[in-house]
């Protein structure tokens, strides 16, 4: 079998790889547990309590990373030869503020993982699944890779 085949089927290389932030490279649920002073995020009674507490705050810029985040980002950079972007869902009703603080977090993590000049495009959408092919707006049939939790 050729290099670009698997099980006799031709493998199609993704056009672009999109990496989600919350729950993939940022410890969103650990941040929630800390914010609510509980041992596990499932101890928080309602989703509305979460939204009410973090709306209008810098919550997203204060999230921690996973022990594997930096190694994972380096792997993505190497595997895609730099052809990847961030896709993240902004907090409903607080889109502008949450995106601002997600950008701050990403700037800090990218600066730490790579260098201060390193940057990646960031897209904010509540329909991340649409980005699994093309740009989420047009369709050429070329698949993308969406890494999400």
PLM features per residue range, with description:
Residues 1-10:
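Short, Lys/Arg-enriched N-terminal segments with co-localized hydrophobic residues
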Residues 11-57:
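Active-site neighborhood of HAD-like aspartate-dependent phosphohydrolases
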Residues 12-14, 81-83, 141-143:
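A general structural motif
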Residues 23-26, 31-32, 90-94, 136-137:
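Short, solvent-exposed loop/turn segments at secondary-structure junctions
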Residues 64, 69-102, 106:
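Substrate-recognition element of Asp-dependent hydrolases with the DxDx(T/V) motif
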Residues 101-114, 119:
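Acidic, glycine-rich loop-and-strand cores that form catalytic or ligand-binding grooves
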Residues 118-149:
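Conserved Lys-Pro-Asp/Glu-containing loop-to-beta segment of HAD-superfamily phosphomonoesterases
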């Amino acid at each position: 079998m050729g290099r670009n085949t698997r099980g006799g089927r031709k493998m199609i290389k993704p056009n672009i790889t999109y990496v989600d932030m919350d729950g993939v490279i940022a410890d969103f649920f650990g941040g929630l547990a800390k914010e609510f002073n509980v041992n596990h995020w499932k101890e928080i009674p309602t989703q509305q309590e979460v939204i009410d507490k973090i709306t209008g705050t810098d919550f997203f810029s204060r999230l921690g990373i996973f022990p594997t985040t930096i190694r994972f980002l380096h792997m993505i950079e190497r595997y895609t030869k730099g052809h990847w972007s961030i896709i993240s869902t902004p907090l409903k009703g607080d889109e502008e503020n949450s995106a601002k603080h997600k950008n701050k977090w990403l700037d800090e993590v990218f600066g730490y993982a790579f260098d201060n000049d390193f940057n990646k495009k960031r897209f904010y959408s509540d329909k991340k699944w649409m980005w699994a092919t093309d740009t989420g707006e047009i369709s050429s049939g070329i698949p993308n890779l969406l890494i999400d939790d």
